[in-house]
């Protein structure tokens, strides 16, 4: 498919399982040294961005009680950049999607604090005006994760239903019960325990959720979202990464904020000049 050699070549059954179920766990992707290095970098950036927020979980909004969310860390922390642009991960994403090239759509830290509530079941891709572009998330844990401390559950085959009704996971309005959608055919979520060094992948249309964190420690997870390089903007509604690059409806993705990460470049990409809010979903507010 490409003249570049994948740093990590996936087995055919791994790819087949992903395309059948819409999610797959891949073991032993990152070694202990890499994990320690990247976890320290992400921890430091999350701490820097949230240093002024001293609220307890109970004092936060319903959405914020699900997790501390810090997005596009690669843009503001050079030590996180090698993880967000990791050629091994990007190559795996391309193989799973069956495309020659992928861009970095976003990264984010999702740190579910002790006592943090469950994350409501939803699809990712319906949040963004990109239609049905091939899109995949890498869910990278820095700690062992079970249903006790914030594991993910995925509805097998739900990606084949395509875009369903968008779920308001901010809970500013009543969240749609997507698990009862008839297009899911009654399929139930499957909980996935995961150890550090493994990565769980899910399609942009896979319905997924996370359990509450009943442990005494913060559940630390970093995600990287990849999108096919030739994807286009389909609708005009506000979307931070597309608005920042002034991408019009019908135009292909471009710009320093969405760099091509597979095939890899010799050097890590330079971050954009304008970056988003320090925490939360980063919609249209920008700061220099």
Regions found by a protein language model. Give the residues of each.
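Non-heme Fe(II)-dependent double-stranded beta-helix
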Residues: 1-21, 26-121, 127-129, 167, ...
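Non-heme Fe(II)/2-oxoglutarate
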Residues: 52, 199, 205-288
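Active-site region of the double-stranded beta-helix
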Residues: 99-100, 125, 130, 140-151, ...
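Generic beta-strand structural signal
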Residues: 100-107, 117-119, 134-140, 150, ...
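Short, structured patches in soluble enzyme cores that scaffold and shape functional sites
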Residues: 106-108, 123, 140-144, 156, ...
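Glycine-rich phosphate/pyrophosphate-binding beta-alpha loops
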Residues: 126, 135, 209-213
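Short, conserved beta-strand element in jelly-roll/cupin
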Residues: 129-147, 193-194, 201, 225-229
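Double-stranded beta-helix
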Residues: 145-209, 231
């Amino acid at each position: 498919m490409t003249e570049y050699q994948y740093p990590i070549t996936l087995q055919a059954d791994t790819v087949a399982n992903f395309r059948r179920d819409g999610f797959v766990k891949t073991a032993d992707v990152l070694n202990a040294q890499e994990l320690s290095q990247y976890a320290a970098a992400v921890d430091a950036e999350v701490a820097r961005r949230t240093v002024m927020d001293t609220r307890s979980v109970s004092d936060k909004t319903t959405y914020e009680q699900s997790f501390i969310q810090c997005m596009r860390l690669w843009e503001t922390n050079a030590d996180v950049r090698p993880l967000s642009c990791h050629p091994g991960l990007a190559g795996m994403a391309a193989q799973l999607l069956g495309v020659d090239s992928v861009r970095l759509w976003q990264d984010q830290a999702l740190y579910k604090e002790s006592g943090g509530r469950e994350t409501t079941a939803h699809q990712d891709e319906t949040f963004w005006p990109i239609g049905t572009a091939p899109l995949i998330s890498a869910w990278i844990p820095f700690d062992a994760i079970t249903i006790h401390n914030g594991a993910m559950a995925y509805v097998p085959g739900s990606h084949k239903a395509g875009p369903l009704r968008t779920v308001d996971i901010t809970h500013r309005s009543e969240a749609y019960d997507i698990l009862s959608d008839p297009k899911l055919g009654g399929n139930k979520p499957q909980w996935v325990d995961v150890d550090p060094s493994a990565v769980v992948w899910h399609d942009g249309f896979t319905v997924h959720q996370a359990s509450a964190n009943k442990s005494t420690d913060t559940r630390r997870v970093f995600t990287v979202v990849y999108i096919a390089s030739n994807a286009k903007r389909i609708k005009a509604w506000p979307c931070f990464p597309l608005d920042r690059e002034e991408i019009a409806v019908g135009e292909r993705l471009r710009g320093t904020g969405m760099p091509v990460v597979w095939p890899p470049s010799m050097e890590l990409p330079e971050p954009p000049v304008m970056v988003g809010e320090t925490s939360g979903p980063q919609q249209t507010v920008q700061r220099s």
